[in-house]
């Protein structure tokens, strides 16, 4: 795992087309902005896991969203 230190307003690059920018820090929360091409899916981890579970035929409890 690569570990980086960034300040508010600073950006990191992932490949040639994806940027991640630190927008703000408040307590233990960090706001980030992700700029990626439309064909690149960007999800929070818990949403990504739910999508993968539903694709595998295991819908999450609570059902409709």
From Swiss-Prot:
Q: Name one GO biological process term.
A: regulation of carbohydrate metabolic process
Q: Which domain of life is it from?
A: Bacteria
One term of GO molecular function: mRNA 5'-UTR binding
Gene Ontology, cellular component aspect: cytosol
What UniProt keywords are attached to this protein's entry? Activator, Cytoplasm, Repressor, RNA-binding, Translation regulation
The record describes the protein's role as: A key translational regulator that binds mRNA to regulate translation initiation and/or mRNA stability. Mediates global changes in gene expression, shifting from rapid growth to stress survival by linking envelope stress, the stringent response and the catabolite repression systems. Usually binds in the 5'-UTR; binding at or near the Shine-Dalgarno sequence prevents ribosome-binding, repressing translation, binding elsewhere in the 5'-UTR can activate translation and/or stabilize the mRNA. Its function is antagonized by small RNA(s).
Under PANTHER family, the record lists: CARBON STORAGE REGULATOR
This chain's protein is named Translational regulator CsrA
Its source organism is Shewanella sediminis (strain HAW-EB3)
């Amino acid at each position: 795992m690569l570990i980086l230190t960034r300040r508010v307003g600073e950006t990191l690059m992932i490949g040639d087309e994806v940027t991640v920018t630190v927008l703000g820090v408040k307590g233990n929360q960090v706001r980030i902005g992700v700029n990626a091409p439309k064909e690149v899916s960007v999800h929070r981890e818990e949403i990504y896991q739910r999508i993968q579970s539903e694709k595998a035929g295991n819908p999450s409890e609570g059902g409709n969203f």
